[in-house]
Amino acid sequence: MTAPEQTYRNKKQRKQQHKLRRPGYAIAKYVRMSPRKVRLVVDVIRGKSVAEAEDLLRFIPRAASEPVAKVLKSAKSNAINNDEMLEDRLVVAAAYVDAGPTLKRLLPRARGSANIIKKRTSHITIIVAERESLSRKGS
């Protein structure tokens, strides 16, 4: 087997293992919103049950709650359909926001100068998992 074939097989195996490690996840990339503003919303739902997180997102008066709700809905659907998890036992195991590429625009100013306006983007990642059974009172 030649070296390129070996590398391809390793990449493919690595990708499959990577998928196995993260059941019930969803990512929204290049969301045209500042990561700082999206983190305010994501911090509220982290660790909550999925049903409670959906209710919270419905009433949070921030623009970032809409894309976060979409990602949460997608992660929930992935967990139920692809990973065969139970809907009523799902919790938000991890939720984080990374900065995407920044679009730079010029704003003309006085005397021929210009300021740079940074239009920031975000990558929103939400991972849901099943809640551990809490019926271990006897042990």
Swiss-Prot record:
Query: Which ranges are annotated Basic residues under compositional bias?
Result: 9-21
**The keyword rRNA-binding is annotated on this UniProt entry:** yes
NCBIfam families associated with the record: rplV_bact
What InterPro entries does the entry give? Ribosomal_uL22, Ribosomal_uL22_bac/chlpt-type, Ribosomal_uL22_bac/org-type, Ribosomal_uL22_CS, Ribosomal_uL22_sf
User: Which Gene3D superfamilies does the record cross-reference, listed alphabetically?
Assistant: Ribosomal protein L22/L17
Q: Looking at the record, which segments are called Disordered? A: 1-21
Which top-level group of life is the source organism from? Bacteria
Question: What family is this?
Answer: Belongs to the universal ribosomal protein uL22 family.
Residue stretches in coiled coil: none
Record's keyword terms, sorted: Ribonucleoprotein, Ribosomal protein, RNA-binding, rRNA-binding
Q: What is this protein called?
A: Large ribosomal subunit protein uL22
Q: Does the keyword Transport apply?
A: no
Q: What is the role of this chain?
A: This protein binds specifically to 23S rRNA; its binding is stimulated by other ribosomal proteins, e.g. L4, L17, and L20. It is important during the early stages of 50S assembly. It makes multiple contacts with different domains of the 23S rRNA in the assembled 50S subunit and ribosome.
